[in-house]
C-alpha cells in the first residue's frame, strides 16, 4: 500500500484507534478486577479465618459464662484477636487492590496518550480527510488545523469528533 493510499484511509485508522481506546476504557474496571483476583490469592486465607471465627463463636455460645468464666473469657479474647487480625488483613488486601487498579489505569491512560501523540505526530501536516470546503466554510481554518489545507480535516479536529461520536455510540454500554 502506497503512502497516498495509507493517508486516504487515515480517517478510518484514527476512528478505529479512538473506538478501541474507548471500548478498552469501558472494560478497564472489569480487567482491573480480574487482574487483582489473579494476583491476589489472600481471599482463601480470609475465608478460612472467617470460618475459624464462626466456629469459635459457635463454641462460645455453648459455654456457660457463669460456670466457666475463664474458658469463656479466653475464647472471647481469641475471637477478638482473630477478628482484629482479619480486619487488618482485609485492609491490607483492599489497599493492594486499589494500588493494582490504579497502576492498570495509569498504564492504560499513558498508552492511550502515547497512541494519540503518535497519531498527531504522523498526521500533523497531512489532512486526515478532505471534504468540499463549502461544508466547513465558517470554521475551515479551525477544522483544517494544523494542516492549512483548504477543505482538509486536521488530526486534532478529527480526534475530537471521533471521541464525541464514539462516546455517544458507546454511552448505552458504559
Swiss-Prot record:
Principal subcellular localization: endoplasmic reticulum
Location of this chain's protein in the cell: Endoplasmic reticulum membrane
Subunit structure of this chain's protein: Component of the Golgi to ER traffic (GET) complex, which is composed of GET1/WRB, CAMLG/GET2 and GET3/TRC40. Within the complex, GET1 and CAMLG form a heterotetramer which is stabilized by phosphatidylinositol binding and which binds to the GET3 homodimer. Interacts with CAMLG (via C-terminus). GET3 shows a higher affinity for CAMLG than for GET1.
Taxonomic lineage: Eukaryota, Metazoa, Chordata, Craniata, Vertebrata
Keywords: Coiled coil, Endoplasmic reticulum, Membrane, Transmembrane, Transmembrane helix
Side of membrane Cytoplasmic, spans: 30-99, 170-174
A single GO cellular-component term on record: endoplasmic reticulum membrane
Name of the protein described by the UniProt record: Guided entry of tail-anchored proteins factor 1
Side Lumenal, residues: 1-8, 121-148
PANTHER family per UniProt: GUIDED ENTRY OF TAIL-ANCHORED PROTEINS FACTOR 1, TAIL-ANCHORED PROTEIN INSERTION RECEPTOR WRB
Family: Belongs to the WRB/GET1 family.
Superkingdom of the organism of origin: Eukaryota
Organism listed in the record: Homo sapiens (Human)
